[in-house]
């Protein structure tokens, strides 16, 4: 009996470590708060509210001049019963967040449109990246009338853009897990 208990202690310790690590990781998790699509002029457009959470290590790296990058990935998929869903459209919005110590400003650059916005606080900069409005995702004419379509969205932190010494820390440290999970919803294919 004692031998069984002794052998299970490492497993118990490992389970506790995994549990506490996952609780700790969720504190910094980026997420999709709200998302919707609507039909405007024969085109479906997306509106989304995102929520970025920063760890102390990410904030420190940013303040030391390390730019941080995110890709917001959006997919429109046609549901198929006996095969994988077919991706009809893909979109990406790429943001670069950087702190300029000389100006004491946070700079957000949309890498797709090259639009740059300056903010005096990190919170304001993150809010600037957190709102998507009227993003065209698919033409109504590309949709089959009786098919079911799904839209997926994910915020992907690009840890490969970090300097090499930080990239090794990212693998082992939950404070650098700044991506979201996929969020999926049904695209209402309006017939009128």
Regions found by a protein language model. Give the residues of each.
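N-terminal signal peptide c-region/cleavage motif recognized by signal peptidases
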Residues: 20-22
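Short, solvent-exposed beta-strand/turn "edge" segments of beta-rich domains on protein surfaces
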Residues: 36-46, 58-66, 82-86, 141-144
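Structured domain cores in non-transmembrane regions
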Residues: 58-125
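Generic short beta-strand segments
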Residues: 49-55, 73-77, 155-158
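Glycine-rich, aromatic-bearing surface loops/beta-hairpins
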Residues: 137-192
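A beta-strand/beta-hairpin structural motif
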Residues: 46-52, 99-101, 107, 111-114, ...
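Bacterial N-terminal signal peptides that target proteins for export
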Residues: 1-12
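Cleaved targeting-peptide boundary
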Residues: 24-33
């Amino acid at each position: 009996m004692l031998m069984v208990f002794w052998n299970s202690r490492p497993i118990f310790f490992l389970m506790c470590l995994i549990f506490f690590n996952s609780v700790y990781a969720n504190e910094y998790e980026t997420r999709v708060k709200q998302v919707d699509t609507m039909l405007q002029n024969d085109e479906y457009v997306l509106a989304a509210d995102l929520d970025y959470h920063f760890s102390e290590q990410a904030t420190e790296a940013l303040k030391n001049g390390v730019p941080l990058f995110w890709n917001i990935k959006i997919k429109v998929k046609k549901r198929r019963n006996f095969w994988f869903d077919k991706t009809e459209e893909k979109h990406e919005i790429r943001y670069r967040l950087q702190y300029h110590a000389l100006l004491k400003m946070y700079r957000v650059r949309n890498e797709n449109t090259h639009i740059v916005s300056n903010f005096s606080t990190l919170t304001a900069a993150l809010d600037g990246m957190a709102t998507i409005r009227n993003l065209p995702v698919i033409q109504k004419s590309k949709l089959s009338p009786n098919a079911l379509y799904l839209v997926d969205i994910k915020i992907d932190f690009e840890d490969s853009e970090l300097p090499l010494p930080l990239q090794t820390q990212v693998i082992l440290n939950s404070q650098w897990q700044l991506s979201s999970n996929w969020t999926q919803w049904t695209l209402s294919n309006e017939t009128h």
